[in-house]
């Protein structure tokens, strides 16, 4: 964590996200924060700005609440689809907590799906997925496989509220545990299970336990490979979104420490919902709230002197629809100047 020295003049970090737009090597951008701080609005706005400077942008929501559809006023689902009014900005909504059963069920119907034929007897399913988080890890791996094959130049993740945000970093370990357990079972009971399953027609797709292990191994490799990219500051960065209140500041600090411990780059904080009452305003509530916000904003700027801290105003209307998002997104690159 940076020291809390006072920073002067030219040393101040630019209060915009321009550095992210200028960094052409970036492939993965995560936007995260506490619930209700304007995470989705920020990720949509950042994606809009990226679409101006990059060939192709994919915006993915991994938040089960799925607010992308609401933000753009357009229905998104598991498949990437173009956002209305853009030729190089697509969006999709996935649920990484979704059960692996959906993927398993697609086994027989989709011959070339990487997960095809993963179906197995209930006993094997229970054994394979008894390790906490393995279904989530495999769902996430499946999403990453799909995303990699789509070859977008940059991918923006609108993540679930903090707590779930960084779970994906533990997935390679989780899958390694599942693989170790399955390998052990396979060596002990493989021949017997294969003969039992063989007697009743085998696994869907005519596979055996070894092929199941190979599939899980390929998913683990996908996650491991992408995680290596996540830890490369040239390819990945994390944008923290917060509001100027104690709990949100505390959550942001916790998240930044966790990101640092995982070796993930973060150098930008967006502070949303700031009030700027006019000079001599008679609104007591506005002035009291501004005073409180000012205190926390000063703390943020002291704590994160080497971060780009972007100050965004509280608006009178909800930011929904293409036009309002575009207007909001401009403030990520051109600092908001409150009216005098």
Curated annotation (Swiss-Prot):
GO terms for molecular function: ATP binding; ATP hydrolysis activity; guanyl-nucleotide exchange factor activity; identical protein binding; metal ion binding; protein folding chaperone; unfolded protein binding. The active site is at residue 63. Zn(2+) binds at residues 283, 286. InterPro entries: Anion-transp_ATPase-like_dom, ATPase_ArsA/GET3, ATPase_ArsA/GET3_euk, P-loop_NTPase. It is found in: Cytoplasm; Endoplasmic reticulum. Signal peptide: none annotated. ATP binds at residues 34-41, 245, 272. Keywords: ATP-binding, Cytoplasm, Endoplasmic reticulum, Hydrolase, Metal-binding, Nucleotide-binding, Transport, Zinc. Its main location: cytoplasm. Its EC number is 3.6.-.-. GO terms for biological process: cellular response to oxidative stress; pheromone-dependent signal transduction involved in conjugation with cellular fusion; post-translational protein targeting to endoplasmic reticulum membrane; response to heat; response to metal ion; retrograde vesicle-mediated transport, Golgi to endoplasmic reticulum; tail-anchored membrane protein insertion into ER membrane. Gene3D superfamilies: P-loop containing nucleotide triphosphate hydrolases. CDD domains: ArsA. One of its GO terms (cellular component) is GET complex. The keyword Oxidoreductase does not apply. NCBIfam families: GET3_arsA_TRC40. ATPase required for the post-translational delivery of tail-anchored (TA) proteins to the endoplasmic reticulum. Recognizes and selectively binds the transmembrane domain of TA proteins in the cytosol. This complex then targets to the endoplasmic reticulum by membrane-bound receptors, where the tail-anchored protein is released for insertion. This process is regulated by ATP binding and hydrolysis. ATP binding drives the homodimer towards the closed dimer state, facilitating recognition of newly synthesized TA membrane proteins. ATP hydrolysis is required for insertion. Homodimer. Belongs to the arsA ATPase family. This is ATPase get3. It comes from Neosartorya fischeri (strain ATCC 1020 / DSM 3700 / CBS 544.65 / FGSC A1164 / JCM 1740 / NRRL 181 / WB 181).
